[in-house]
Structure formats: structure tokens, C-alpha cells
UniProtKB/Swiss-Prot annotation:
Name used for this protein in its record: Conotoxin flf14c
Secretion signal, residue range per the UniProt entry: 1-22
Region (Disordered): 53-89
Domain of life: Eukaryota
Basic and acidic residues: compositionally biased ranges: 62-85
Species assigned in the record: Conus anabathrum floridanus (Florida cone)
Free-text comment on this protein's domains from its UniProt entry: The cysteine framework is XIV (C-C-C-C).
Cellular component aspect of the GO annotation: extracellular region
Amino acid sequence: MGFRVLVLIVMVTTSALPFTFSEESGRSPFRPALRSEEAQALRHGLTLLLARRADGQTPDMHQPEMRRPEMRRPEVRRPEVRQPEFAESPVGQKRWDAYDCIQFCMRPEMRHTYAQCLSICT
């Protein structure tokens, strides 16, 4: 019961008190406390938290829907890096995989470490 009251107080505070005191010189003593997006994200997170708590699940702040939108990591695809010496082979020959690339890269005449070859080939 106490947890729900605390959450409701926070939700009401973010929507009912849009201003806080600011002591910066040259500005109005009042400024918006939270941008509307921040307040909306906070309310959304608290609503999800209450729903999970009501279902008996423990809240997991690492799940993307519990984070503020600007904290979510965008889905990034790692671009494929093509090295000139490891170019695609002609038709009929086996295409190199990362293991073959590392084996070639670590030959003594290449003078690369395993870590360097791993970063080159993957």
C-alpha cells in the first residue's frame, strides 16, 4: 500500500507542480521542472512498474520499455568491413570465414597479434 501511495504522489507531483525555483541570475525565478516528454516518460515508467507489481512480477529496469525514450539504445547494425586482401573469391572457390581470415592474418610475415587479426576479420 505504501509503495502505491508513493508512486501516486510522484505522478501527481510531476503533473501538478510544473515549476521549481531557479536561482540563476538574469532569468525568471521559475522554470519548468520537467519537460513534457520527461514527465510523460516518468508517468509511463511508473504505470508499467505498478502494472508489474500488481501482476506479482519484479520490476526489471534493464528492459527497454522501462527506460526513458532517450535512454533507449537505437538498434545499430554493424557494417560489414571488407579488407582488400580478403576480398571475395571467384565463383567455385570457398569463401573465407572469420577463422580462415584470422589464420591468414596471423602468419609470421603479416606481423599482427591475435587481437589485431580478430578486429580486422570480424
